[in-house]
């Protein structure tokens, strides 16, 4: 495996808190559950948008047989309730995952056995109801819910419980599911390293020197020149990754043929959602174009525990099955789609270095995207969390390094490590990308390495309903769905955040679910509104997710060179505003460049490439120090810094990119910018179309030189060097070639008879010969003619000579020699300087007109002096294409808010920036530096007719439970001074005088008692009574009191008897008082001990 491969060692499903190594993937769900610290069992239920059970519902979670119909609804709602979790999933079909021509192929040992179109009906993405901006859901609904739920800073995984009860269930119900948090995953094996196989010369080097496969030191030899990259800009555009997904035979056997397809697509659905997050800084669409399920081993594909060898085999195999009859995004005649990257999912417990199980979960070449044999990855199946492994590995193919490896992400005070983290901890967020990952992929795409992702393949499109559900079902109906036909809404203030309903027991309750979007609402500032994303907004308005917009360009940076043509750059960011609530990332140019310091360097200055190579003289290479010179041979990238070790027979790439402004090749004005060769006009302006003519005159018409061409044949061989042709000083485009493949040798001689170059038999010829102010390129091989070429101009006259050997040569020569001044035509056409740009920003134009000039003094003369046949065409180019600074754009005043008396009128005031002559973009008000013009102003009309006036609302009556507020509505004169009969005002415009309200729950009915009445007797024991009534909180009679708590209405009482004083002073006679008839009872009940009874029944009680 190439040394640029990265290995993702993620333990089980995100592996939070990983200080361990995964030694094997879970082979059964029982093994997974035993490894969890905690999990819950839930029964997901198909519901409506309010969480109410569906009265009639199509089958949910039912395993679809081949050919069977499938649920094709674009919007679904599921309730997932467990002891400590409660989710209401709002799901929308994922139309962007599958290309329109995606197929599922089943392969046996002999190859493709059969195929069919893939079914995308099970793939959904969305959010929790009422939490669109803070939650994420990606699931498959075939055979149960398989997927991820992200909410409240926690990630949950859900999947059907294998072996659960199979009893009868309604069509809207499902079987038991396992719900567990990512943080509950654990594993006993410890190993913190994420292996990266690397070579010693690359250790400690910056990431940009290690992103692509490091080239080895190569011996000198014959190389062929690679074509240069075309001109590209740093542009944010939508990319499409057409993906081949392959599941090996162990995957098919483990998950079963009937379920493996939807299982794999559920994983890829999560992968696609990860790449759509705006934190990536680019719009990347993962599209599955081909799904291959292997039922048997393939003859040329070897998959084992050894990840490196398996990946090598898979990369070659997937390249071999690519159709060569397709072009771009066209579907080949054989119906097999091409792909940009290939993903292998295996049940093997893979390991990077050995054919035994260990902790490796994924492997992919870094920077391999769009390279046929390197855009591939192997991923171990560990459940739904395999999606994070696949996204991580595809990130590597985009040139991403691990967060914290060769970059600052993850360090203290820096951007935290995220999806590309080598080690996942509790603080790692694997659902977003770090700023380092964003920089890696942006650099990769801007360097032109992702060209295969620009074509847009056909995909399946769906039409979604647009009617707000709250308009179809009002709040009372939503309550009835949840709590029965007698339920209704019972609280009205915060209906958009929580819907409160009367339960069957007549209590006002809520399940914390907001009312459906579109439900009518009312606030202190909004008389009529509707609910939208848990907020009451003016009726009819629909706040949407905010798409990102470009911010202003930064000032131009420093020039990369002080002379010879450098580069200055300016950039902008997608932050005005940043994309929010699922808004799209910006499309367009993110970095621009311009030429600077185009003046020639002083004579004798060191070559710019030589200077960069020499800086590595003090850097050890494989433990030794070398003197480095520029390597000028072929077979290397034009904009990489490839240096030759002086005195040694090898060269190597010392930097992936030269400094901006370095010429791409000798004898060219094109320069390198950000590692790619960009076109430069002969005026040394980046992107200029100005070219040299055949005389090497910038913008010339070719009239300053003439072409000299001929064939020379000497009379006899062996007579020494013979003169072939004299080339005058100033000649350009010199070319000499031996047509007979003879053993002759070429030589150059100056005017002073000095031999500048001599080719002797048997002497190897160098490739580059700096002579006469230019560079001659000498090419000679056993199977090609000897040739000598130079771009020129030469600063001295030269004579071409030939030494003929056994065979007579035939030399073809051609060059453009300057025309003597007196031979020039007196007048000729020339381009005038470019006119001033027609606009200061947002795209203007410049024109370069043609004028007739005198050749002797270059003065302009009348056009008729020049020939009309040779007139040059007028030129035009774009200029000042950068957007204009933000400014306020003011609209016309509206009509007065009132047709009578004093009112206000308004106008639109928008901060916007002109991007081009035909496009303007609205910005946030803070982007405009000038004060905002007024939006409102007063206006005056005729006297107004009478109108309705309202007084303040009364208190809610009754004081508890459902009630009403009242207010007085009067017909008033326009000046509000007189009250008029109601008939003077328009009846249709009369405001409501009552409004429903609800303060609190009313207290229950209670028993009320009166004071106790008088005792029934005047002396002794008797009874007294009181009244007991059941009354409501309003004091009205009620029957709702609890009978068991009813107070008593009667109790015993005792009246004090008057004392009897006998006359006289003698001793009192002991006798019973005649009027007391109960003395026998006093004796019977032993009351004689009491003073009263002893006195009244003295005789009876005597002696007792």
Swiss-Prot record:
Q: Per its database record, what is this protein's job?
A: Metalloprotease that participate in microfibrils assembly. Microfibrils are extracellular matrix components occurring independently or along with elastin in the formation of elastic tissues.
**Active-site feature positions:** 393
Q: Where is the Peptidase M12B domain?
A: 239-457
Q: Does the keyword ATP-binding apply?
A: no
UniProt PTM comment: Glycosylated. Can be O-fucosylated by POFUT2 on a serine or a threonine residue found within the consensus sequence C1-X(2)-(S/T)-C2-G of the TSP type-1 repeat domains where C1 and C2 are the first and second cysteine residue of the repeat, respectively. Fucosylated repeats can then be further glycosylated by the addition of a beta-1,3-glucose residue by the glucosyltransferase, B3GALTL. Fucosylation mediates the efficient secretion of ADAMTS family members.
Q: Which GO terms describe its molecular function?
A: metal ion binding; metalloendopeptidase activity
**Out of the domains of life, which is the source?**
Eukaryota
What lineage does UniProt assign to this protein's organism?
Answer: Eukaryota, Metazoa, Chordata, Craniata, Vertebrata
Q: What is this protein called?
A: A disintegrin and metalloproteinase with thrombospondin motifs 10
Q: What class of enzyme is it?
A: hydrolase
Free-text domain note: The spacer domain and the TSP type-1 domains are important for a tight interaction with the extracellular matrix.
Coiled-coil spans in chain: none
Cite the PLAC domain residue spans from the record: 1066-1104
> What keywords does the record list, in alphabetical order?
Cleavage on pair of basic residues, Disulfide bond, Extracellular matrix, Glycoprotein, Hydrolase, Metal-binding, Metalloprotease, Protease, Repeat, Secreted, Signal, Zinc
């Amino acid at each position: 495996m190439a040394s640029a491969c990265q290995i993702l060692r993620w333990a089980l499903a995100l592996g939070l808190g990983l200080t361990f190594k995964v030694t094997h993937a879970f082979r059964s769900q029982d093994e997974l559950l035993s490894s969890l610290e905690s999990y819950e069992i839930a029964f997901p239920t198909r519901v409506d948008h309010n969480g109410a059970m569906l009265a009639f519902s199509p089958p949910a979670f039912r395993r679809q047989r081949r050919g069977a119909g499938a649920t094709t609804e674009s919007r679904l709602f599921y309730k997932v309730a467990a002891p400590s979790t409660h989710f209401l999933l709002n799901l929308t079909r994922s139309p962007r995952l599958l290309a329109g021509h995606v197929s599922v192929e089943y392969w046996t040992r002999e190859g493709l056995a059969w195929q069919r179109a893939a079914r995308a009906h099970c793939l959904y993405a969305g959010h929790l109801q009422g939490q669109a901006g803070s939650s994420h859901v990606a699931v498959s609904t075939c055979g149960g819910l398989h997927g991820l739920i992200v909410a409240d800073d926690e990630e949950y995984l859900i999947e059907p419980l294998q072996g659960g009860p199979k009893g009868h269930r309604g069509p809207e119900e499902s079987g038991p599911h396992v719900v567990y948090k990512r943080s509950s995953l654990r594993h006993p094996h410890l190993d913190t390293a994420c292996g990266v196989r690397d070579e010693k010369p690359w250790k400690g080097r910056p990431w940009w020197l290690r992103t692509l496969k490091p080239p080895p030191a190569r011996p000198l030899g014959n190389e062929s020149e690679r074509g240069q990259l075309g001109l590209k800009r740093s542009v944010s555009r939508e990319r499409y990754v057409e993906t081949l997904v392959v599941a090996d035979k162990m995957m098919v056997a483990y998950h079963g043929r009937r379920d493996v397809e939807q299982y794999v697509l559920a994983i890829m659905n999560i992968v696609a959602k990860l790449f759509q997050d705006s934190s990536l800084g680019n719009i990347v669409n993962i599209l599955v174009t081909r799904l291959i399920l292997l039922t048997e081993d393939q003859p040329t594909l070897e998959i084992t525990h050894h990840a490196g060898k398996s990946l090598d085999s898979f990369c070659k195999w997937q390249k071999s099955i690519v159709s060569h009859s397709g072009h771009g995004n066209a579907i080949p005649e054989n119906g097999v789609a091409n792909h940009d990257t290939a993903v292998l999912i295996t049940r093997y417990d893979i390991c990077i270095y050995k054919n035994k199980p260990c902790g490796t979960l994924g492997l992919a070449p870094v920077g391999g995207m769009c390279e046929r044999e390197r855009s591939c990855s192997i991923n171990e199946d560990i459940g739904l969390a395999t999606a994070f492994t696949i996204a991580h590995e595809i990130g590597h193919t985009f040139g991403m390094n691990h967060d914290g490896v060769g970059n600052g992400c993850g360090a203290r005070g820096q951007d935290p490590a995220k999806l590309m983290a080598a080690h996942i901890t509790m603080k790692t967020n694997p659902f977003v990308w770090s700023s380092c990952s964003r920089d890696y992929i942006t650099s990769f795409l801007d360097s032109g390495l992702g060209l295969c992702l620009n074509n847009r393949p056909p995909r399946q499109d769906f039409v979604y309903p647009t009617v707000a559900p709250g308009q179809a079902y009002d709040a009372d109906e939503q309550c009835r769905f949840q709590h029965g036909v007698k339920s209704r809404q019972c609280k009205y203030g915060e209906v958009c955040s929580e819907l409160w309903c009367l339960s069957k027991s007549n209590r006002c309750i809520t399940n914390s679910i907001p009312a459906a979007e579109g439900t009518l609402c009312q606030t202190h500032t909004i008389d009529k509104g509707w609910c939208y994303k848990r907020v009451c907004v003016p009726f009819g308005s629909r706040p949407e997710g905010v798409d990102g917009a470009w911010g202003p360009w930064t000032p131009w940076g420093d020039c990369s060179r002080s002379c010879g043509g450098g580069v200055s750059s300016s950039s902008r960011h997608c932050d005005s505003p940043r994309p929010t609530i699922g808004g799209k990332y910006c499309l367009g140019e993110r970095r621009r460049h311009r030429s600077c310091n185009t003046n020639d360097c002083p004579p004798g200055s060191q070559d710019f490439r030589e200077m960069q190579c020499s800086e590595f003289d003090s850097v050890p290479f494989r433990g030794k120090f070398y003197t480095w010179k520029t390597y000028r041979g072929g077979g290397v990238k034009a904009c990489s810094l490839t240096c030759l070790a002086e005195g040694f027979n090898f060269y190597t790439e010392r930097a992936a990119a030269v400094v901006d402004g370095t010429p791409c090749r000798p004898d060219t004005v094109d320069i390198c910018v950000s590692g790619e060769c960009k076109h430069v006009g002969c005026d040394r302006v980046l992107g200029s179309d100005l070219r040299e003519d055949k005389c090497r005159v910038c913008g010339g018409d070719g009239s300053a030189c003439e072409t000299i061409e001929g064939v020379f044949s000497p009379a006899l061989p062996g007579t020494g060097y013979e003169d072939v042709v004299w080339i005058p000083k100033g000649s350009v485009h010199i070319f000499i070639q031996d047509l007979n493949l003879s053993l002759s040798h070429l030589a150059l001689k100056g005017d002073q008879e000095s031999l500048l170059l001599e080719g002797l038999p048997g002497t190897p010829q160098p490739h580059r010969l700096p002579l006469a102010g230019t560079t001659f390129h000498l090419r000679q091989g056993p199977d090609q003619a000897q040739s000598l070429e130079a771009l020129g101009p030469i600063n001295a006259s030269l004579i071409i000579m030939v030494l003929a050997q056994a065979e007579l040569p035939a030399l073809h020569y051609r060059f453009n020699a300057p025309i003597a001044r007196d031979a020039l035509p007196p007048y000729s056409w020339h381009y005038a300087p470019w006119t001033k740009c027609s606009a200061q920003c947002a795209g203007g134009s410049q024109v370069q007109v043609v004028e007739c000039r005198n050749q002797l003094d270059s003065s302009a003369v009348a056009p008729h002096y020049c020939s009309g046949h040779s007139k040059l065409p007028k030129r035009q180019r774009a200029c000042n294409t950068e957007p204009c600074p933000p400014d306020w754009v003011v609209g016309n005043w509206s009509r007065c808010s009132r047709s009578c008396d004093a009112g206000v009128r308004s106008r639109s005031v928008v901060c916007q920036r002109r991007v081009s002559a035909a496009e303007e973009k609205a910005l946030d008000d803070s982007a405009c530096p000038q004060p905002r013009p007024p939006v409102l102003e007063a206006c005056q009309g005729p006297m107004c007719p009478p109108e309705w006036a309202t007084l303040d609302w009364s208190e809610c009556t009754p004081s508890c439970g459902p009630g009403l507020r009242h207010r007085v509505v009067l017909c008033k004169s326009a000046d509000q001074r007189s009250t008029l009969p109601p008939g003077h005002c328009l009846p249709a415009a009369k405001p409501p005088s009552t409004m429903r309200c609800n303060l609190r729950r009313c207290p229950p009915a209670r028993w009320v008692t009166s004071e106790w009445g008088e005792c029934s007797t005047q002396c002794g024991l008797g009874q007294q009574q009181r009244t007991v009534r059941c009354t409501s909180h309003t004091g009205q009679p009620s029957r709702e009191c609890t009978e068991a708590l009813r107070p008593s209405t009667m109790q015993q009482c005792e009246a004090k008897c008057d004392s009897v004083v006998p006359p006289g002073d003698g001793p009192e006679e002991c006798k019973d008082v005649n009027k007391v008839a109960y003395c026998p009872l006093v004796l019977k009940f032993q009351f004689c001990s009491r003073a009263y009874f002893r006195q009244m029944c003295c005789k009876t009680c005597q002696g007792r």
